[in-house]
Amino acid sequence: MNFPRPLVPATLVQRYKRFLFDAILADGTAITGSCPNTGSMRGLTIPGSPIWLSEHDSPTRKYRHMLEIVEADGTLVGINTGLPNRIAEEAIMAGQVGNLHTYGTLRREQRYGRNSRIDILLSDAEKGLAYVEVKNVHFSRVRGLAEFPDSPTQRGAKHLEELGDMVEAGHRAIMLYLIQRGDCSRFRICRELDPVYARAFERASARGVEAYAVKCAVSPGQIVAAGPIVVDEPVPAVL
């Protein structure tokens, strides 16, 4: 996924009200911009952090700048939650997510489950249907290890249950964790921050839901899928 124009470097002053941030541009100009991530962004909102911003000239936008990348401990981390589905699609087509690239048709945002939409629905005359839910991941406390979630997510647990229902209906169901950073070689569920989600993941795994994790190469010019990493989670023997 290439950015349409080069990102603008800046220094983070603060992120607040979930949707906003203040920053200082390289020329010393103080600006306020929009943050396309309503999550906790744990570890990525430290004042003084180097950041990169996209610029938007539309007269209908209240803020010209939008936060895209934060540097954390020397690693560039993508924070825009609107990008993972596009990057995940590229990863699938590049053969980085099992054999999903062999399916004949890919559709986006299809209705399923209990008033939900699946991020990616794959179909094939021989293989049938494969439901792919994509989760954005940027949390890392231990070097080389990516974790999800970084805060409680009831919606995430619901998605796992719905994927399990698809397996029981005779289809494939995949949870794809898209890690918007390149310094991780393993992924696991963060039980300490959301034990409910962890239990939902274990139940879904036992029902046959598959889990994959793909890391990204992040730069101010592009964010691209950089290959699969290990999902460090045992499959439970019982529900």
From Swiss-Prot:
Transmembrane segments: none annotated. InterPro entries: SfsA (IPR005224), SfsA_C (IPR040452), SfsA_N (IPR041465). Pfam families: SfsA (PF03749), SfsA_N (PF17746). One of its GO terms (molecular function) is DNA binding. NCBIfam families: sfsA. HAMAP family: SfsA. Belongs to the SfsA family. This is Sugar fermentation stimulation protein homolog.
